[in-house]
Amino acid sequence: MSGHSSYQPSTGIERWLDTRLPIVRMMYDQFVAFPVPKNINYAYAFGAILAVFLIIQIVSGVVLAMHYVAQDTLAFASIEHIMRDVNYGWLIRYIHMNGASFFFFAVYAHTFRGMYYGSYKEPREVLWILGVIIIILMMATAFMGYVLPWGQMSFWGATVITNLFSAIPYIGDPIVTWLWGGYSVGNPTLTRFYSLHYLLPFVIVGVVMLHVWALHVTGQTNPTGVEVKSEKDTVRFTPFALTKDAVALGVCFIAFAWFVFFVPNYLGHADNYIPANPGVTPAHIVPEWYLLPFYAILRAVPDKLGGVIAMFGALVVLLFLPWLDGSKVRSAAYRPLYRIFFWLFVADCIFLGWLGAMPAEGIYPTLSQVGTVWYFAHFLVIVPALGYFEKPKPLPESISAAVLEAHSRPSLLARLINR
């Protein structure tokens, strides 16, 4: 998608800098004049939303780190100090807490959009793999951040999740001891998690830069899945795509503000407002909502090692999706059978999320096993089979042809009026 630069320095300073460090030219080419397909919809705005929320999380996290004390006897009190004594500390903390939830909601929506429109297919395999790596890094960062308040759910969540490594034969127990910094979760564990929680967002920034670089090499996908064939198929990123992203961000910020100011603890857990007590186990240990589907997969397998393999396998299988899907058609808009199974997969992920919040008793483990089998069957059986047997609809000749065809059809309102 890259071509000859259209940037023209307008001042002497810009011309001087352009001959020595053409950073303004690079920003102009990548974020102003960059060509994007003219038919992208609001589903493509989640990338911009993710970029903004990554910045919000880093800035709010750095400010919180100035007042947080990574010591097991003071961590909980330091959080209360932030809430009560630091100017606008309550606001910064609630922004950081709910920002994490919105960050994950956006990344899941971004991933589902990529699966629906085939954004993982050739030549965008590396782009997709980098995206999956970002999700894995986000989960690690979020888990470590969940431990820092040192409440009941923080302490016992850290105990349960880190204990999973003990399932690894021969080396599992030494790994757990190394993670804990001793023989139980304590102050060394907290300081290690605090250090890594501060570091990993900047690692995510680095991978995001590679992700954006890969995107700008291969170009943006679009709802038809047809590649750009001429300049008629594209528009400039600024102002066209930027305006669409701004509208989506505005709607997102309205919802975000509602959570921050009116229901800031709705997505959290009440037990985390109780100081950590190694002698009292919570009745029901659960992670944050955005990790619940994988927690359900973990608990679906009775064997401890099998559960760990299944949980990590649920992420690893995403890395191989570009090669599991053999269909020549990218977009689900032209794949009727794939579209049905895609929405069943989305429903299964939501189902697993609900099961992850339920106690591991009664019928819930059995339902988790059903949901887990369907999750892996989607990638390992259904998607490869559809690539061979599905008969897709005819593709448009170009993006421009698809846009003209869509505009030639009467709108829903017009069809209702003409009845």
From Swiss-Prot:
InterPro entries: Cyt_b/b6_C (IPR005798), Cyt_b/b6_C_sf (IPR036150), Cyt_b/b6_N (IPR005797), Cytb/b6-like_sf (IPR027387), Cytochrome_b (IPR030689), Cytochrome_b_C_euk/bac (IPR048260), Cytochrome_b_N_euk/bac (IPR048259), Di-haem_cyt_TM (IPR016174). Its cofactor is heme b. Keywords: Electron transport, Heme, Iron, Membrane, Metal-binding, Respiratory chain, Transmembrane, Transmembrane helix, Transport. GO terms for biological process: respiratory electron transport chain. Heme b b566 binds at H110, H211. Binds 2 heme b groups non-covalently. One of its GO terms (cellular component) is respiratory chain complex III. The chain crosses the membrane at residues 46-66, 89-109, 126-146, 160-180, 199-219, 247-267, 305-325, 340-360, 370-390. One of its GO terms (molecular function) is metal ion binding. It is a multi-pass membrane protein. Heme 1 (or BL or b562) is low-potential and absorbs at about 562 nm, and heme 2 (or BH or b566) is high-potential and absorbs at about 566 nm. Component of the ubiquinol-cytochrome c reductase complex (complex III or cytochrome b-c1 complex), which is a respiratory chain that generates an electrochemical potential coupled to ATP synthesis. The main subunits of complex b-c1 are: cytochrome b, cytochrome c1 and the Rieske protein. Belongs to the cytochrome b family. This is Cytochrome b. It comes from Blastochloris viridis. The lineage of its organism: Bacteria, Pseudomonadati, Pseudomonadota, Alphaproteobacteria, Hyphomicrobiales.
